[in-house]
Amino acid sequence: FSVYKLGSDIDKAVKFNMPSILYMKQGKTNKCVVLRWVVGNDALLIDPREGKNILPVKTFKNMITEGVVFYKNRYKGNSRVLLLQQELKARGLYDYPVTGKAGPRTKQALMKFQEREGLVKTGELDEETAVMLSNTGGAPKLTPE
């Protein structure tokens, strides 16, 4: 697994639609909670000491000092382009042979994916794009249980 640092931007955690670990100011110290789901303006936070709390996002948004999301980064190593092309093809964004070699068609398909997901269109497999691509199938989502 890989770790992506969200900074203090909860909107990014919501965009990724994956449970996140948030560090929040509590007096002079920080506490750690899990952002389990967001529905509308409400979020379920799980605190190891206080248990589950459903709170309006606006009540704790400015208290967040850092956040991280763990994701399975399949796009490392020699076969990263091959896996990327397969994933883009499965999503209907890449209609060409899967070769494992990056080119303008792969870049164009990746830009379509980035645009669809609200990411900056770079055509590069940056970390934010890898997080969004990993958010498939069995990956947990920010939805109520």
Q: Language-model features: where?
A:
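Alpha-helical context
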Residues: D11-V14, I64, Q86, D95, ...
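Glycine-rich phosphate-binding loop of ATP-dependent small-molecule kinases
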Residues: E145
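Generic surface-pattern signal
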Residues: T65, N135-G138
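Solvent-exposed soluble domains appended to multi-pass membrane proteins
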Residues: K58-K61, T65-N78, Q85-R91
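Conserved active-site-adjacent core of cysteine acyl-enzyme catalytic domains
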Residues: F1-V68
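Short acidic, glycine/serine/threonine-rich helix-capping segments at coil-helix boundaries
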Residues: K76-R80, K89-N135, L142
